[in-house]
């Protein structure tokens, strides 16, 4: 420091003194009678510096760096007579040294602290107090106790069952290559799921009436649902649900594509007509929502978009949605739905992989308990959310009324009449034709949805449509693994 001035000031007593380095001879030790300040006159040589004054602070130190910056702009002013640091840094020369550093900070306005995450969340369309509710129960007893503590004395169950064509091959691994709707003395995955959920929620259902609907068959496709009984009457207990299911399955024609929007909208109609009673919609399905090969990455297919919109709309009602996945999957998109659907009043959607739980090496009773727990563990906080959001016990007034189609069966039921809800007479959107589709037309249609033309071929030579083909892992005709997909037109 100051090396360029040492030659001009060679007449000073000591070329290594502080004054010679600063080119200020008047600050030398012989220019004044004041004793040199003990803290700002240390020589830069290895000689030990004078003892510091008691209790020095970093701001009151007067080393060489300080003196060059502090006094370079004031060469004609003598130093003050004493340099003892003041007790406060604000009154010392340390404050003068750091004045440049603090000047900009002092001139800045006093901004408030940045908003917290909770404040940012308030700007969004849903309350994150009810978003991504943690899985914090470990037994069915805890679930029952939590339901009671939350005041859930009455919970109404709604059941929706997937009758799409993919049920015929998505049991290749998990159901011994049989259709997931195969009927025998052993309950199929749909019957197992209905039984476990029905037994668990039976204690909370006062009237024991269960609205049941099917979707994805040849009469509904991805547009409508059909009621298990004519005129939309409900089933009396889950035992009747199982019995009626066995009556319907042999007479159905599985089709597609898959969309959960119609069954969610039907459940919304049921909740609205009940004047806002709390309901749990259990959707049992073998696959996720149809996604066309033409759908760009990062975008949703029409079926996916309608399903997301329906889930968001359902969060304005006291309605929880539990999707039970049966069969081989895949279920990656359903996990995305469970975790990341935005813009909801509360977290109203829960996905449970039935196959994964029931394939564990455990006793059957323990697997059933684990499944019921996984399906219902989020019901208590979701029920609390409907109370705090003032959704319970009131009509929304802005819910479109969906009318279910009649069951696609010819025979009536032997069960006595239960309750007939106040639905308008159902009018099917598609005219029924008395004659069967010709075999020539059948050959040209996709064997999965039975509605779209065949426009995608696999390596084995068999064909489907471009909406159904991307979701397949094995050919639905010959069961060969699909490694090549070719769009025909």
From Swiss-Prot:
Tissue: Ubiquitously expressed.
Keyword Transport: no
Biased composition (Basic and acidic residues): 1-10
Zinc finger (RING-type): 446-479
Lipidation (N-myristoyl glycine): 2
GO CC, alphabetical: nucleus; plasma membrane
Disruption phenotype: No visible phenotype; due to the redundancy with RGLG2. Rglg1 and rglg2 double mutants show a complete loss of apical dominance. The double mutant seedlings rglg1 and rglg2 exhibit a dehydration-tolerant phenotype.
Enzyme Commission number, as recorded: 2.3.2.27
Comp. bias intervals (Low complexity): 11-23, 58-75
UniProt entry keywords in alphabetical sequence: Abscisic acid signaling pathway, Cell membrane, Lipoprotein, Membrane, Metal-binding, Myristate, Nucleus, Stress response, Transferase, Ubl conjugation pathway, Zinc, Zinc-finger
Catalysed reaction equations from the record: S-ubiquitinyl-[E2 ubiquitin-conjugating enzyme]-L-cysteine + [acceptor protein]-L-lysine = [E2 ubiquitin-conjugating enzyme]-L-cysteine + N(6)-ubiquitinyl-[acceptor protein]-L-lysine
Subcellular location: Cell membrane; Nucleus
Main location: membrane
Segments of skewed composition (Pro residues): 34-57, 76-88
GO-annotated molecular function: ubiquitin protein ligase activity; ubiquitin-protein transferase activity; zinc ion binding
Membrane topology: Lipid-anchor
InterPro entries, alphabetized: Copine_C, E3_ligase/Copine_domain, RING-HC_RGLG1/2, VWF_A, vWFA_dom_sf, Znf_RING, Znf_RING/FYVE/PHD
PTM summary: N-myristoylated.
CDD domains from the UniProt entry: RING-HC_RGLG_plant (cd16729)
Region (Disordered), start-end ranges: 1-125
Domain VWFA: 156-376
Listed GO biological process terms: abscisic acid-activated signaling pathway; negative regulation of response to water deprivation; positive regulation of abscisic acid-activated signaling pathway; protein K63-linked ubiquitination
Subunit structure: Interacts with the heterodimer UBC35/UEV1B. Interacts with ERF053. Interacts with PP2CA.
Function noted in UniProt: E3 ubiquitin-protein ligase that mediates the formation of 'Lys-63'-linked ubiquitin chains. Regulates apical dominance by acting on the auxin transport proteins abundance. Together with RGLG5, mediates the ubiquitination and subsequent proteasomal degradation of the target protein PP2CA. Functions as a positive regulator of abscisic acid (ABA) signaling through ABA-dependent degradation of PP2CA, a major inhibitor of ABA signaling. Acts as a negative regulator of drought stress response.
Entry protein name: E3 ubiquitin-protein ligase RGLG1
Gene that produces this protein: RGLG1
């Amino acid at each position: 420091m100051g090396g360029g001035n040492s030659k001009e000031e060679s007449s000073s007593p000591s070329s290594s003194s502080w004054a010679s380095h600063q080119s200020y001879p008047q600050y030398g030790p012989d220019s004044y009678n004041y004793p040199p300040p003990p803290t700002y006159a240390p020589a830069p040589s290895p000689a030990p510096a004078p003892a510091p004054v008691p209790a020095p602070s970093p701001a009151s130190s007067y080393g060489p760096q300080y003196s060059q910056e502090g006094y370079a702009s004031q060469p004609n002013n003598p130093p003050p007579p004493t340099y003892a640091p003041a007790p406060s840094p604000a009154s010392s020369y340390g404050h003068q040294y750091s004045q440049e550093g603090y000047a900009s900070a002092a001139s800045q306005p006093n901004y408030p602290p940045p908003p917290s995450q909770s404040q940012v969340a308030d700007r969004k369309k849903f309350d994150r107090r009810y978003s991504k509710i943690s899985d914090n129960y470990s037994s069915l007893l805890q679930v029952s106790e939590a339901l009671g503590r939350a005041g859930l004395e009455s919970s109404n169950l709604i059941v929706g069952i997937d009758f799409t064509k993919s049920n015929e091959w998505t049991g290749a691994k998990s159901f011994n290559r049989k259709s997931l709707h195969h009927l025998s003395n052993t309950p199929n995955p749909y019957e197992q799921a209905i039984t476990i959920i029905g037994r668990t929620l039976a204690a909370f259902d006062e009237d024991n009436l269960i609205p049941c609907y099917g979707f994805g068959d040849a009469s509904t496709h991805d547009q409508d649902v059909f009621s298990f009984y004519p005129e939309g009457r409900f089933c009396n207990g889950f035992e009747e649900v199982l019995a009626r299911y066995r009556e319907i399955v042999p007479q159905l024609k599985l089709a597609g594509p898959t969309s959960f929007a119609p069954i969610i909208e039907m459940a919304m109609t049921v909740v609205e007509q009940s004047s806002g009673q709390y309901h749990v919609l259990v959707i049992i399905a073998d696959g996720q929502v149809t996604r066309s090969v033409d759908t760009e990455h990062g975008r949703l297919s029409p079926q996916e978009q309608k399903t997301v919109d329906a889930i968001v709309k359902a969060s304005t009602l006291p309605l929880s949605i539990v999707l039970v996945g049966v069969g081989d999957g895949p279920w990656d998109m359903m996990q995305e739905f469970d975790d990341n659907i935005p813009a909801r009043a509360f977290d109203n959607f829960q996905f449970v992989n039935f196959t994964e739980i029931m394939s564990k090496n455990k006793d059957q009773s323990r697997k059933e308990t684990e499944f019921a727990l996984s399906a219902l563990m989020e019901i208590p906080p979701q029920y609390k959310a409907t109370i705090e959001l003032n959704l319970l016990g009131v009509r929304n007034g802005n819910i479109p009324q969906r009318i279910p189609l009649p069951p696609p069966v010819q025979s009536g039921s032997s069960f006595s009449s239960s309750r007939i809800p106040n639905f308008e007479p159902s009018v099917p959107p598609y005219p029924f034709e008395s004659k069967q589709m010709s075999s020539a037309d059948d050959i040209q249609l996709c064997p999965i949805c039975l509605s779209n033309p065949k426009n995608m071929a696999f390596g084995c030579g068999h064909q489907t449509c471009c909406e159904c083909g991307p979701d397949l892992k094995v050919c639905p005709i010959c069961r060969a693994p699909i490694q090549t997909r070719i769009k025909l037109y």
